[in-house]
Regions:
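Short, mixed-charge low-complexity intrinsically disordered segments
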Residues: 36-77
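Extended, non-core accessory segments
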Residues: 4, 13, 34, 75-77
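A short, exposed loop/beta-hairpin motif centered on an aromatic-Gly-Thr core
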Residues: 14-30, 63
């Protein structure tokens, strides 16, 4: 079997993209939080956001994925 059709990345125009292929929005959100903390330690701000990669094409999150992201934000420790 091949790769999953959809995975998630964190990416920004200045800080660039993480090198991970997150299987879930929750994992991508934890990666984003890590980048935010790292940027703060460097005295800057993270410009990354979570994007979906669907069959090799980067796209914005759709409604059900935005709901998953909202849930991840509310339940993050």
């Amino acid at each position: 079997m091949g790769e999953e059709a959809v995975y998630y990345i964190t990416k920004g125009p200045i800080r660039g993209a993480c090198q991970h292929k997150h299987r879930t929005i929750d994992y991508a959100y934890h990666c984003l939080r890590h980048d935010i903390r790292s940027a703060e330690k460097e005295g800057t701000r993270s410009d990354r956001r979570i994007l979906a990669v669907d069959n090799g094409q980067v796209r914005e999150l759709v409604e059900h994925e935005i709901c998953e992201l909202d849930y991840a934000r509310r339940t993050a420790l």
